[in-house]
Swiss-Prot record:
Residue numbers annotated as active site: 71 (proton acceptor)
A single GO BP: nucleotide metabolic process
Compartments (UniProt record): Cytoplasm
Keyword Cytoplasm (UniProt): yes
InterPro entries: ITPase-like_fam (IPR029001), Maf-like (IPR003697)
Gene Ontology CC: cytoplasm
Keywords of this entry: Cytoplasm, Hydrolase, Nucleotide metabolism
Reactions catalysed, as given in the entry: dTTP + H2O = dTMP + diphosphate + H(+); UTP + H2O = UMP + diphosphate + H(+)
Name of the protein in its database record: dTTP/UTP pyrophosphatase
Chief place where the protein resides: cytoplasm
EC number in record: 3.6.1.9
Species assigned in the record: Dictyoglomus thermophilum (strain ATCC 35947 / DSM 3960 / H-6-12)
GO molecular function: dTTP diphosphatase activity; UTP diphosphatase activity
Cofactors: a divalent metal cation
Amino acid sequence: MKKEIILASNSPRRIDLLKHMGVDFKVVSPNVEEEGNGEKRSPVEVVKKNAIMKVQKVAEDYRNAIIIGADTVVVIDGEIIGKPTNEKDARRILRKLRGRYHFVFSGVAVMETPEDKVLVSVVRSKVKMRDYSEEEIERYIATGEPMDKAGAYGIQGKGALLVEKIEGDYYNIVGLPLVRLNSLLNRLGYSLL
């Protein structure tokens, strides 16, 4: 019997990326409390733990599936930055990132049930933001786009206009490193191709 593929995420970006790959999958909200925002913990451990928590939670109800979970954070000056809590927080984050490099870490976990085998990996990318103006920050916040994104920007949307350059996996910055995900799926005998 073919296993159902489940994305343990509410992220529209992750959903769009898997759809773009032509994957037949179901979206299930993991309903877990993510850890790490604003903390000085290891971003690698934070995104790994959050991705694993998501697949394990969904696995409780899906016992013949391939479950995919991911978590993404932005790190600057050792601070883990998740999604902004409000517009004031988005403004603070965008000011902190302005004209500087930061790192984006995504943890991706794949769990096969009923075997309950979990594979997890972390991808890191480096992003340099432009020295954008206060007016640009205000216009960007007014779009609403920063509010549900780690680091208060979406590189796949208008946030791309704030970015000067990237080093590493673009899809990692969007929130789902597809090449690494495919590598994990390959180890379980599946493929995005």
